[in-house]
């Protein structure tokens, strides 16, 4: 009995709770290991102790399995809680995410990005504005005013800076703006302003806010020199953009006089004439009167080659047009007038022309006399309706009188305007007046 008691006393852990391991504490938390041995059980045999130890070993194995299942359930819970975030991710990334939930890791990129200066640049469209788009007393506002005041206009012809004449009021405004600019420059302690005057072969740059002086910013901050664009590059970009977008009114007066041709005032005398064969046109069955090209295309749809009709032109400068079928589609051609002759191209002397419109239509009826680019008028499309009596009376009256003779008729003025509707203008004389004197 004494030996058994000594063995049991050796197995009892006499260390304090603070010095015990975590495994010992966990053993105390379970049922079988947490029960204290009473003095009555100390007298049990050694075989009973061995059975107890065997039972404890089986319990330890069961507890290890429970821990494994609990860990796997935790991983499943993490997968369900994170949703699609863990899909397609490696085990290492999952572990890093799980550790990051317990011990948040600082983002290095945000720490470095907060310390660096802003890389905001001034766009060319912002430099073209009349008012500063940036908040006052900001770095971008200072740069905007700096570029606007110290960049001279560019001559697009010589690609050099040209001096401009300023009035007294503009000079005063420029001096005031320059003083304000110097005061604003003193507010920035990290920059030094060094003026630099640039001269060219043709013109010297004058002093003032709108001259060819370039201001170079010398920065004392190494971070700003490395990360942000220098002011010299901004000025170069601005001057090149102004060279491309320079308006004509910025050029010098002498250059404008040399480049622009002299202007002359001309007086053109016209003679008004009525259509000579208006009655024959009205009696022609291919004449359809007032009609646009869309209605003509609808009438000519599906017709054979050479089918045509004569109609009034939709343009005020022309009287008549022909619509015809050629190359399996509907085409249109205006009848032009020049020197009392009618043709389809008045500017080409090789094109056939006729003193009346009916003769022009008769010429293009023959396919052998028609070129490939000229209208083919072989088959007329017959009109399906008669003209009004008023229109027929107008054609008969115009066939018996002239344009100036209509004014002598004893009829109302509205009737005279109606009779003069089908007429054309022909140039008689072109007189050049107010010609500038030739300079010796």
From Swiss-Prot:
| Sequence ranges of Basic and acidic residues compositional bias | 12-29
Query: Residue ranges under compositional bias (Polar residues)?
Result: 1-10
User: Which UniProt keywords are present, listed alphabetically?
Assistant: Growth regulation, SH2 domain, Signal transduction inhibitor, Ubl conjugation pathway
- Tell me where in this chain the SH2 domain is found: 286-381
Q: Which domain of life is it from?
A: Eukaryota
Pathway(s) per entry = Protein modification; protein ubiquitination
Q: What is known of its domains?
A: The SOCS box domain mediates the interaction with the Elongin BC complex, an adapter module in different E3 ubiquitin ligase complexes.
Report the protein's function. Answer: SOCS family proteins form part of a classical negative feedback system that regulates cytokine signal transduction. Substrate-recognition component of a SCF-like ECS (Elongin BC-CUL2/5-SOCS-box protein) E3 ubiquitin-protein ligase complex which mediates the ubiquitination and subsequent proteasomal degradation of target proteins. Inhibits EGF signaling by mediating the degradation of the Tyr-phosphorylated EGF receptor/EGFR.
Q: What is this protein called?
A: Suppressor of cytokine signaling 4
Tell me which species this is from: Homo sapiens (Human)
């Amino acid at each position: 009995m004494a030996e058994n008691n000594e063995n049991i006393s050796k197995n009892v852990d006499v260390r304090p709770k603070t010095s015990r391991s975590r495994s010992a504490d966990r053993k105390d938390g379970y049922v079988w290991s947490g029960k204290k041995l009473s003095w009555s059980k100390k007298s049990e045999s050694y075989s009973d102790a061995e059975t107890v130890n065997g039972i404890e070993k089986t319990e330890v194995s069961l507890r290890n399995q429970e821990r494994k299942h609990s860990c796997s359930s935790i991983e499943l819970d993490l997968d369900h809680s994170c949703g699609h975030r863990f899909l397609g991710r490696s085990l290492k990334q999952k572990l890093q995410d799980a550790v990051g939930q317990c011990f948040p890791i600082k983002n290095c990129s945000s720490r470095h990005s907060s310390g660096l200066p802003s890389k905001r640049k001034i766009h060319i469209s912002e430099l073209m504005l009349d008012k500063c788009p940036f908040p006052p007393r900001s770095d971008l506002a200072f740069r905007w005013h700096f570029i606007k005041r110290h960049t001279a206009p560019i001559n697009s012809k010589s690609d050099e800076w040209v001096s401009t004449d300023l009035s007294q009021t503009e000079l005063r405004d420029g001096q005031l703006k320059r003083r304000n600019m110097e005061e604003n420059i003193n507010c920035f302690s990290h920059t030094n302003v060094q003026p630099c005057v640039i001269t060219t072969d043709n013109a010297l740059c004058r002093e003032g806010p709108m001259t060819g002086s370039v201001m170079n910013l010398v920065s004392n901050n190494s971070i700003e020199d490395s990360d942000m664009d220098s002011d010299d590059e901004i000025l170069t970009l601005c001057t090149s953009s102004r060279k491309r977008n320079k308006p004509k009114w910025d050029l010098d007066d002498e250059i404008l006089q040399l480049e622009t041709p002299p202007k002359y005032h001309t007086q053109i005398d016209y003679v008004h004439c009525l259509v000579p064969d208006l009655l024959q046109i009205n009696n022609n069955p291919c004449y359809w009167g007032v009609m646009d090209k869309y209605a003509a295309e609808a009438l000519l749809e599906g017709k054979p080659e050479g089918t045509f009709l004569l109609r009034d032109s939709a343009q005020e400068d022309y009287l008549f047009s022909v619509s015809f079928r050629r190359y399996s589609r509907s085409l249109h051609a205006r009848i032009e007038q020049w020197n009392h002759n009618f043709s389809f191209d008045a500017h080409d002397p090789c094109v056939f022309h006729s003193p009346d419109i009916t003769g022009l239509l008769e010429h293009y009826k023959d396919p052998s006399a028609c070129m490939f680019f000229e209208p083919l008028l072989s088959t007329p499309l017959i009109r399906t309706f008669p003209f009004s009596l008023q229109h027929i009376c107008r054609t008969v009256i115009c066939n018996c009188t002239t344009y100036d003779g209509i004014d002598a008729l004893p009829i109302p003025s509205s009737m005279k305007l109606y009779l003069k509707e089908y007429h054309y203008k022909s140039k008689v004389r072109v007189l050049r007046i107010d010609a500038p004197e030739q300079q010796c």
